[in-house]
């Protein structure tokens, strides 16, 4: 009897120990899955060198008074820019011969493009800003700015770009040109809300701001943004007008010094527009891509399954243990009963 009791006790303990090992192993798999799955969607992101341009193209009208989109495209190609913010872009207007400038520029440069119309029914077409990009454009939206008075409608064109397995928010704007800065300052107050929609993304804010570095507008923007020219620009950086530039009113603003390192900034000479282009080379670290709905759904399913495995095994062990005890008791091999007899 004692021998049978010892054998029954050993068999039960062996099964329990084996069950505990299985539970521990499954818990390890669950932890491993929890650590591994989010990482599947966020690979290591290495910095990339970007060449960025902002350019008020004056509907492709040069200093000679001729509309010539090929001259604009040539300026862009020669700069080797990866991303371009364009202002004063016409689409199908009478004054430019009905040319679809955004589509034509995309064809001439071999880049992706999005267009933001700030004026509809203008000269039989549209007028606004555009963004050219060598990188895929994942989404874009043109925000019409509120105004304090009657005047030309202004806007902020934002595009989320897929850069080196990460993301960048690229923004183009063209603010009011009047001597009174009130409208420009009012426009600036609306920027915070627009960028809050993409708070997790590093951003570039480019365009024709129609104000100088000594202005109140520049002072306000400098509290949240970094002027690329102030980091690496040489000489005066004047961009307006192109024949004899006297003012710096075109800017490339950086949202964070953490994600951006400005290598150099330059103002190439050209007579293709009344503005000169502003070009910067920037070392950029993209933001990791956020996990999308399909990936989140997959993560939830997998983690649910992984969590269920140890629970199921534990339940099986408990049931098996109770069954073994019952069988041992019925056969007279219950270790507790055996021990009490000696």
Task: State where each predicted segment sits.
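Active-site beta-strand/loop signature of hydrolases that rely on acidic residues for catalysis
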Residues: 49-57, 72-98, 132, 159, ...
């Amino acid at each position: 009897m004692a021998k049978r009791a010892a054998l029954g006790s050993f068999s039960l303990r062996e099964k329990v120990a084996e069950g505990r090992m299985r539970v521990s192993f499954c818990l390890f798999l669950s932890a491993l899955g929890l650590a591994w799955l989010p990482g599947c969607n966020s690979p290591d992101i290495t910095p990339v060198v970007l060449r960025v341009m902002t350019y008020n193209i004056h509907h492709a009208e040069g200093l000679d008074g001729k509309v010539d989109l090929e001259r604009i495209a040539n300026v862009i190609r020669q700069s080797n820019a990866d991303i371009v913010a364009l202002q004063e872009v016409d689409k199908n207007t009478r004054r430019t011969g009905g040319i679809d400038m955004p589509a034509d520029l995309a064809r001439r440069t071999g880049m992706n493009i999005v267009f933001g119309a700030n004026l509809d029914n203008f000269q039989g077409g549209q007028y606004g800003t555009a963004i050219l990009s060598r990188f895929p454009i994942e989404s874009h939206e043109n925000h019409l700015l509120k105004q304090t008075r009657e005047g030309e409608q202004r806007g902020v064109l934002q595009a989320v770009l897929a850069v080196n397995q990460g993301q960048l928010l690229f923004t183009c704007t063209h603010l009011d040109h009047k001597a009174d800065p009130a409208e420009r300052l009012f426009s600036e107050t609306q920027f915070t809300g627009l960028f809050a929609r993409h708070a997790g993304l590093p951003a570039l804010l480019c365009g024709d701001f129609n104000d100088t570095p000594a202005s109140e507008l520049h002072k306000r923007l400098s509290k949240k943004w970094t002027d690329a020219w102030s980091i690496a620009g040489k000489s005066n950086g004047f961009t307006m007008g192109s024949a004899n530039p006297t003012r710096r009113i075109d800017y490339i603003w950086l949202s964070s010094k953490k994600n951006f390192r400005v290598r150099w900034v330059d103002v190439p000479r050209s007579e293709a527009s009344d503005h000169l282009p502003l070009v910067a080379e920037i070392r950029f670290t993209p933001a990791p891509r956020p996990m999308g709905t399909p990936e989140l759904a997959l993560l939830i399913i997998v983690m649910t399954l992984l969590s269920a495995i140890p629970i199921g095994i534990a339940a099986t062990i408990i049931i098996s243990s109770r069954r073994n005890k019952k069988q041992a008791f019925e056969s007279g091999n219950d270790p507790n009963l055996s021990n009490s007899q000696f």
